[in-house]
Amino acid sequence: MKPAPHVRSSVSDDGLILLDIATGQIFSANPIAARIWNGLEQGLLLTAIIEEIAADTGADPVVVQRDATEFVNALRLRALVEEF
């Protein structure tokens, strides 16, 4: 999965801002979501992103997987990401 071509992003220590230039809608998300977005931009698989976040934060991998999947599903619903 990768960011859709009509989406622009800005990542900071505070999190993530996404702009859908096709609709003019703006979305914001927390710093962990920003890490997921960065991983998707780099072409990483979601499983690799989840493993990295769990290892770096010490969070339960099951919880990270649940939250990451929920975030990515929200991106899909809004057509902000697309399959390779």
PLM regions: where:
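Long, charge-rich, low-complexity alpha-helical segments
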Residues: 12, 25-84
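Long, low-complexity, charged/polar intrinsically disordered regions in eukaryotic proteins
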Residues: 1-21
